[in-house]
Amino acid sequence: MQKNELEQKLLQEEVSKDLYSLKGGLPNESYCFNEQNGVWEVYYSEQGIKSNLKTFNSETEACEYFYTSLIEMLKGMGVI
């Protein structure tokens, strides 16, 4: 899965865009996906801090991890 496919899957699942960022950065209380210098990052951003940072050398692995982790978290919270 590539980033554009990830975005489409999240739209199909009707996951609110307020809950995640596929552009990285440090939005408050968002699950984030970012590429920096060929390394893909997945993390939770809260109050300007990257929490639970995971790094990947593969976009595919990062996308799959992001999707699975975000969906599991949202199901656990009863959001979806």
Describe each model-derived feature in a short phrase:
Residues 1, 50-57:
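Short, exposed beta-strand "edge-strand" segments with a Pro/Gly-rich flavor and a Y/T-containing core
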Residues 1-25:
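Negatively charged, low-complexity tracts enriched in Asp/Glu with abundant Ser/Thr
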Residues 18, 29, 41-42, 63-65:
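Intrinsically disordered, low-complexity segments enriched in small/polar residues
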Residues 18, 36, 56-59:
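Surface-exposed loop/turn and secondary-structure junction residues enriched for glycine/proline
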Residues 20, 73-80:
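Intrinsically disordered, low-complexity charged/polar segments
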Residues 24-51:
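Short aromatic-glycine-(Arg/Gly/Cys) micro-motifs in beta-strand/loop hairpins
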Residues 55-73:
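A short, charged, amphipathic alpha-helix used as a generic interaction element across diverse proteins
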